[in-house]
A protein has these predicted regions:
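Canonical tetratricopeptide repeat
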Residues: 84, 151, 185, 219, ...
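Alpha-helical segment of the N-proximal tetratricopeptide repeat
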Residues: 41-70, 74, 114-133, 137, ...
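Residue-level recognition of tetratricopeptide repeat
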Residues: 44, 53, 77-78, 87, 120, 145, 154, 179, ...
Length: 488
């Protein structure tokens, strides 16, 4: 496991993410120490903060929050502790208050710590370029701090910046060739690039370095699943749970793997266990959405409707508005009736604005997905004026942000609308900017077919057929594609 975006947009994305890799313009004074210092008056708080970082690297994603909460209780002025609570918590109210506390204390910190706080806070507040610049300056100040290189690379992977992340992991491993956290994430980058032999070799090293930790087994299970080796995946997830029965992400992994294998009944059994032992409310809701998706995979849409509606209601009651919005969006994505889908997408948008505690970055990313779906639905129903309206709103969101997720939503939506207009040549460059999405890949295959680009068609179709990720897009596109004869 690892800690799981106009015409000018391509250039904007390239610019923003190119800034993520250290540029070494030498405009930032190097730190006096090799590693980033931590300002605190309490040795116990420092130990707890460092334990939190160790737990974070080993993917104990709720335990590290508990460590950091204990650290700031020992020293309420531990700004970087507050910053990482804001970064990693799943509680919107806690995220908002912790970020405010970190920013309030920032003036008392060293320059490097100030950059760390700025990176986290600016990104969450929607200033993507400002956050990347702060992160980049932090890395330039402490170029041999392997932990900072990992933290930055791990975040970049979540923003689809795989190439930039890979360079950071490789640099971290040049400092310490046996650094487990970087080795783990580098394997994920290789797997995303379909270089599974390299990824599996890294996993063997990762397990050897941390034989008593569950995450190496969990990661190996996920990468094997990505490659299509489901039985091998199940073995490693079970091995992780044997090492730590409370490593709930491996329990979730069993459910996800059975779902991809087509055994939805067993998937629900495994998901129920994950839901029961979830460490926080946000995770419990997310696992419940995965369970509801099994009914979509079975074609039991009435039961799926019921499941997602119940999750949305629970999320609303628990003030988990992001998960409420996600539930309504998923409910819309598999509907055959465009008006029903549109109704649920409207509810998804409303959920994002029930309270102001959702971070701007989370709100904007989810809104970009909602707008993408609305543009596609409008185009599908033949309402080109409405499709253009939704696309223009998404374009405005993309032009105001360097966020790669938002940029991808825009390109995917633009390409979808162009495909509906039979503008295949114009659609291709837009779709190619979002080619990891099964919805987009399906359209890209059609566009290559219509423009007689046979080699690219085969490449895109092979990639589409090989996608083994437990997402709604995969559920709606990939099994149906596999059931059809390949093009040409």
């Amino acid at each position: 496991m690892r800690r799981t975006v106009s015409i000018q947009a391509c250039a904007v994305v390239a610019l923003a993410l190119s800034l993520a890799a250290p540029l070494y313009a030498h405009h930032v004074k190097k730190g006096e120490s090799t590693t980033l210092p931590v300002t605190t008056s309490s040795p116990k708080a420092l130990d707890l903060y460092r334990k939190g970082m160790e737990d974070y690297e080993n993917l104990y994603l709720e335990r590290c929050n508990e460590d950091w909460r204990a650290a700031v209780k020992e020293d309420p002025n531990l700004a970087v502790g507050w910053a990482w609570i804001a970064f990693n918590s799943t509680n919107p109210e806690e995220i908002t208050s912790a970020r405010a506390k970190a920013k309030e204390l920032a003036t008392k910190l060293t320059a490097g710590e100030q950059l760390m706080v700025a990176w986290i806070s600016k990104v969450q507040e929607g200033d993507f370029l400002g956050g990347i610049t702060a992160m980049n300056d932090m890395l330039e100040m402490y170029p041999r701090d392997k932990h900072l290189l990992y933290l930055a690379g791990n975040w970049l992977m979540g923003e689809n910046g795989n190439d930039q992340a890979k360079r950071l992991f490789e640099k971290a491993l040049s400092i310490d060739k046996n650094y487990p956290a970087a080795l783990n994430d580098l394997a994920y980058v290789d797997a995303r690039n379909l270089q599974f032999a390299k990824a599996f070799a890294a996993m063997e090293r990762y397990i050897a370095l941390l034989p008593k930790e569950p995450n190496p087994q969990d990661s190996y299970g996920e990468l094997l699943r990505m490659s299509g080796n489901f039985e091998g995946s199940l073995l490693h997830y079970r091995a992780a749970l044997k090492l730590d029965p409370d490593f709930v992400t491996s329990q979730l992994g069993l459910g996800d793997t059975y779902a991809l294998m087509g055994n939805q009944e067993q998937a629900r059994v495994e998901y129920d266990k994950a839901i029961r032992f979830a460490h926080n409310e946000a995770d419990r809701l997310t696992y419940s959405m995965q369970k509801a998706m099994t009914f979509v995979r079975e074609g039991n849409y009435a039961e799926a409707d019921k499941g997602y509606a119940e999750i949305a209601a629970t999320a609303h009651a628990k003030k988990q508005n992001l998960q409420e919005a996600q539930s309504y969006r998923h409910l819309a994505e598999y509907q055959t009736d465009d008006s029903t889908a549109w109704k649920n997408l409207k509810l998804a948008e409303e959920a994002l604005h029930h309270q102001s505690i959702i971070s701007p970055s989370d709100r904007n990313e989810e809104m970009s997905r909602i707008l993408r779906n609305r543009a596609a639905r409008a185009a599908h129903s033949g309402n080109q004026a409405l499709a253009e309206k939704e696309l223009h709103e998404l374009e405005a969101l993309a032009n105001g942000s360097r966020n790669r997720v938002i940029q991808s939503s825009y390109h995917g939506a633009f390409g979808t609308v162009l495909m509906d207009q039979k503008k295949f040549e114009a659609a291709i460059p837009q779709l190619e900017e979002d080619r990891d999405n099964p919805f987009t890949l399906e359209l890209l295959v059609q566009a290559y077919y219509q423009t007689e680009q046979t080699e690219k068609l085969h490449e895109a179709e092979a990639k589409l057929r090989g996608i083994n990720v437990p997402t709604m897009e995969q559920a709606l596109v990939v099994p149906a594609t596999r059931a059809q004869r390949p093009h040409i």
